[in-house]
Amino acid sequence: MNNNRVIFKVFPEHRIIKAEISDCVFDAIYEFNRKFLAHSTSSLSLSTFYCQDEKFIMPNTFSVVVRCHPDDKFDEEKGKRLALNRLADKYTKSLNKHLENILNAIDESLYELANHL
């Protein structure tokens, strides 16, 4: 997850911090191409045009809300760190799930291809 894409919204009067990242739809496909095909000598890559299956595309936006307990002192920086960590966990779980879906689809396709040879 690129932290530069994270937007924080701070509501001190409600003791709430919201962290959000957008434009994540094709992140799993981009990550697959970067991790698994970057060192390939061919021009092979997954195209976002051909990977419109819901199993491969991530939600567009991820967000988390962190609330400060009434007995605690509201600390904006601490809240932002906590929100960022929770957002990163949520995003990473989804990314890993979608990468696994891509790898499973490739595995199934290779199995079918091998059976046709």
Could you tell me what each predicted segment is?
Residues 1-117:
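Catalytic phosphate/metal-binding cores of nucleic-acid and nucleotide-processing enzymes, i.e., regions
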